[in-house]
Amino acid sequence: LHVTVLVICWKETSRLASQIRRLYGANRRAEKPFWLCLTEFAVGSLIYKECFRMNDGFSSYLMDTTQESYLDLFPSDAIVYLTPDSENVLEDIDPNKVYILGGLVDESIHKKLTLQRAREQSLQTARLPIREYMVKSLSSKNYHSETLAINQVFDVLSKYYETRSWPAALKAGVSSGKGYMLPDAVK
């Protein structure tokens, strides 16, 4: 099973490097690890340097890194670009697909940027089934966002792949700060 992290590096590179470290650590601990590949990961780029600076042993990480685009590595009909703006719900994980997690970290959220990129490339898209399995929290502190960090998306995928349970997977990856909770947690 393949998960490819697209490195769309904007201004928050240290956060992305940290998310890559967390994602990698979660994959190492997973009962069913994924094959990981960082694509468009240019040697000497800011994110490249930041990954080596922030992540001890990064050069020994058991994952592939390449400057190439995922479009050059995989058939387009095998690619599923995960984006919170997709109309398509990810219902299951297909071991014959390559799932793209867009490594976009930017404080000024660009609405539908990952969806737009996937459409421009004529790729299948899907979103995690947050709305289907979770409800909005009534807390006024929460702003109800389905946009997750790449390590959180990975945690959801990994837990689902292990348990085949979306509620368990979403509980593992969607923090309460996103403003969603499982219905049985609503009191």
Give the predicted meaning of each segment.
Residues 8-10, 44-46, 88-91, 107-110, ...:
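Eukaryotic short linear interaction motifs
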Residues 81-83, 91, 95-102:
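Calponin-homology-like cytoskeleton-binding modules
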Residues 96-187:
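C-terminal folded domains that constitute the principal catalytic or ligand-binding module
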Residues 1-88, 140:
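RNA substrate-binding interface of SAM-dependent RNA methyltransferases
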